[in-house]
Amino acid sequence: MSLNNIHAEWLSLVDISGPFLAIPVLTHTFPQGLEVLSSFKRRRLRQAYDEWREALELEDPQLEELHSAWIDEVLSRVLEFDDDGKGDVLKREEWCRSHLKSVLPDQGVVEYPDLAVVDEQQDNKPLLLIHTYKPNVELESTVKYEGWITTPADRMVQLCRSLGCRLGLLTNGECWMLVDAPVGAVTSFSSWYARLWSQEPITLQAFVHLLGIRRFFVDESEQLPALFDASLKYQDEVTDALGEQVCRAVEVLIQSLDKADQDRNRELLHDVNETELYEAALAVMMRLVFLLSAEEQGLLLLGDECYESNYAISTLRMQLRQEPSELLERRWDAWTRLLSTFRAVYGGVEHEELRLPALGSSLFDPDHFPFLEGRTKGSNWKIDTAVPLPINNRTVLLLLESIQLFQGRTLSYRALDVEQIGYVYEGLLERTVKRAAEVTLELNATKKAQSPWVTLAELDSVSMDGTEQLIELLHERSGSSISKIRNDLSKLIDDSLIERLLITCQGDTKLRDRIKPYVHLLRTDPWGYPLVYPAGSFIVTSGSNRRETGTHYTPKSLTEAIVAETLTPLTYIGPTEGIPREKWQLKSSSELLTLKICDPAMGSGAFLVQTCRWLADRLVESWTLAEESGKKISVDGYILGTSSTQEYLPHDTDARIVIARRLIAERCLYGVDLNPLAVELAKLSIWLVTLAKDRPFGFLEHNLRCGDSLLGIERIDQLTQFSMNPTAQGQKHLFSDEIECAVDEAVVLRQQLRKMTIRDIHDVESMGELNSLAEVRLKITRCIADAYIGEVLMAQGNGTDLEKALAHLSIQVRDVIQGNTEQLELIKQRALTALSFELSVGKASRRPFHWPLEFPEVFSLDGGFDCIVGNPPFLGGQKITGAMGDCYREYLVNTIACGKRGSADLVAYFFIKANALLCSSGFFGLIAVNTISEGNTREIGLDSILRCGSVIYRANPNLVWPGKANVVTSSVFVSKSNWNAPFYISGQQVPVISSALTQRENWQPVKLK
C-alpha cells in the first residue's frame, strides 16, 4: 500500500473537525510510514480494554479504579509518557494544580489540567495538557462547571489558550480527542476510538505515532504544532477541490435536467428561466447536505429499518454502490427516493410503519421547484400527480459521492463545521446558467481560463483562416499551451471515443463529423462523454465573480474574535464603564432576547452562525444565574412568575443550548445579502446550528432578506419627505400618513410574529401568514420607495432634475394611495427602468433594500440595531464605477458620504451605513482592508464616523488575511455611545484610537495658499 493510501485509510477512520494534518505533510514527515507496535504491547492493550469494557457494562463497583488504570495504561505504557514511573515527563494532578493553574478571565473560573506532558529541559514547559472524564461523559456534549456552561472539548481549548500550550488531549476512556488550539486561528479536533484499535490497527498505529513521547522531543519542524502549521497551506486547496467537486455535480444535475427537457420536446422547462434552474440544482445539493447532517446527528429516523431502507440519504450511496454499473444507467428509482424524502421532511409522515413530524421550510417546499418532480408551475404537490424525471441512478450516485467522499475518505457531517460547509458552497454562488444560442463546445481548459466555451460556428469560421488562427483561438479560450493544442489536434481518435461523441450528438453523424477534429480538446463528463451543448441547451457558466467584487468568505478564526469582541460590551454590564472583568454582570435573559444583531453583507451566514452560538451560550448562562437565585425559566426562555403554569426549561444542558440557539436565531438575528442564493445558504447555515429533534425548521424568512444594503432608505422620513437628508422641520407629503400607518401595522404584525413559539409546523405556518400579511401591507410603500431611490440614482446629484422627477412621482403616488391601480403599475415600471439605469442589457435591475420597511420593528421601536458585525466587500474606489456604474458611485457620494468626494473603497460606505443603522447605544465590529485607515477611504469613512460622536474602542490593523485572498486587513470596533473603558490596538492598551487606527491624533492635510 502506498504512503498516501496508508494515511488516507487511517484518516478516514478518525473523526476530524477543523483543519487537520494534510496527507502531503504526513508523507513528507514520515517517509517510512507508521511505526508498528510490538505484539506484546498490542495484546496488553487489548486485554486492558476488554477488562475496562466489561467493568463498564457490568457496572463493576471497582469501575472508578479500573477506569483510571485503563487511562494510565494508554498514557504511561502505550504512549510511553511515564513508562518508568518516575513522572519526569507526565505530571499528575497535584503537580498540575500547583504549577499550571489558570484563571479564565471570560468565564471567571480557575482551571488546570488533570495531567500534563512537560519538557523538563525547558523548565517543565507544558507540551500537552490532558483532561480525563468519566465513561458516561460525551466530550462534545454541554456540561456545567462552576456556573460555566461549555463542552469538555471547548473547555480544553480555553485552558490551552490561557496557558499558552497549543495541544490538548481529553478522554472518557473510549474517545481520545486531540485538540490543536493555535491562538488567533481555527481550532482542530480529532477523535480516535479505542474500540477500533483492535478492529482497525492502523488507527492505533497513527495514534501512537502522532502522540507517542518521541513526537514531542524530535526536531521542532517534526513536532505536531509544526505539522499542523505546514498543513494549513493545503487547507484552501482541499476546500477548493471539494467545492469544485460539488460544482461538477451541480453541472451534471443540470445536464440531466436539460436532457429530460429535450426528451419532452422542451416542454418541461419552457417556463423556467436560467436563474430558476440553477437555484433548483443548488437547492437539491443543499437539501442533501442538510439531511446528511441531520441524520448523522440522530435528528431524523436513522436506525429505523423502514427509513434506512427507503428514505435515508446516508445509506443510499452504499445501496447504489451495490448495483452493477450497467444497471445504474438504466434505473431511475434513486431520484424518486430523493424526492420522496424531501416531501417527507417537508410535510411529515404519519403511518403505522413510520412517523416523522413535518419540518417545513422554503428549502424543502415541493412547490418551490415543481419541475424537479415533473410538474408544471402553479401545480400543487398535494393534489397534482408527479411524474419524476428520468434522472438515472448513476447521476444520483455522483451527486451523493460529491458531497460524501473526498479523496477516498467519507466525510462526516457531524464533524464538519457549518463554516466549512458554507465555504464550500459559497463558491457555487459565482456560477449561473445560460442557454446556448447555437451548438457550443466546452474545452478542457486550465483553471485560469475565464471562458472555456467556443461555438462550433466560430471554429468552422476560424479554420478557414488557417491552422495558426485556429490554434490561437483555442489557446485564448482554453489557456492550454500552444504545443498541447497542436498535439491534441493531430492525435488519433479511437473508435470508442467516436462512438461516445456520436451519442453526445444524439446520433447526428454530420454534427459528429464537424466536431471530431476537436474532440481531444473537449472536456468530458464524469463518464467520458465529450461536452457538446446543442442550441437551446443549458450551460453552467461563471456568473458574478464574488472575489473580483471584493467578496471573500470569512474564516472562523476571524468571525469568533470579532463576534466576541463586539457583543461583549452589549451583553454585560461593566465593559463600557471600565469595571474590572471579575465584577461584570451578565444581562438578564429577557434583555438578551431583545437584542437585534445584523450582518449587512452576510454571504452564507458565517457571522450570524457565530453570533447565534456565542449569544446562545450567554443566554444559557443567564438562565443558570436566574435559577440559582430561585427563579424558574419557561421553555420560551423567560423568567416565570411564582404561579405560572407554563412549561419549564428542560434540565438537560444540550437541550438548553439548542433552545437558546433557536430563540436567538428567530428573535435576534438579521441579515442582508445582494445574492438571493447567499440568503438561502445563510438560512441553511443557521438551520444546521439550530437543529432540534422533532422540531420544524425555525422561521427565518422575516429576518434574512435579499437586497443591496447600501441602496435604499434607512429612515422612514426619507420617504415621507422625499429627501435623503430629512429634517425635523421638513415638509411631509400628503401621502405620508398612509405610509406611516402601513409601517405601524406591519410593526404590530411582526411583533406578534416575534412573540410566537415554534412547537410544530402549524406554528411555522402561522408565522408565515403573519409575515405575508406584513408584506402585503407594505407592498405599495415598498414600490414607492423603489421608485424614489430610482429617481435619486438617475439624477446623479442634479438637484433640479431630481426635484422635477419627484414632483411628478408625488402626483402618481397620491393617485396610488387613492386606489388607482393603473398608476401603481406605472410606478413599478418607472422604478424598474430607473433601477436599471446604466446596466447592460440582460443584467438584472438593482435591488434596493429599504431598512425601515424590511425590518420595521427595528427602526420604528428601537431606532436601529444594537449591534452590526460582518465582512463587507473589499472593492477599491477606482473599481466601483466599472463594477456598479457612474450613477451608483454618485449615489454613494451624495447620499451616504453626504457629498464628500474622493476615491474611497466601497467598505468606507459600509462603515458609514453601519454607524447610521445602529441605535444610540449600539456597537459595530467590521473587517476592512487596511486602506480603511488611509487616504480618501479614512477621510470619507472613519473620519466622518468619529465626527458623528462615535468612538473606536478597539482595532487590529494590518492583519494578513488567513486565506487565499491577497489582502491585508484591519478589524475595527466602534461604539456609538460613550466609552469609559480602556482602548486597545492589537491587544495593547492605548489612551485613544484615531481614524488612522493609531494612538496619535490625525494630522489633516491643508492646501497651501
How should each PLM-predicted stretch be described?
Residues 1-9, 107-110, 132-141, 146, ...:
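Signature of N6-adenine DNA methyltransferases within the class I
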Residues 1-166, 184, 227-231, 240:
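A short, conserved, highly charged catalytic patch centered on acidic carboxylates
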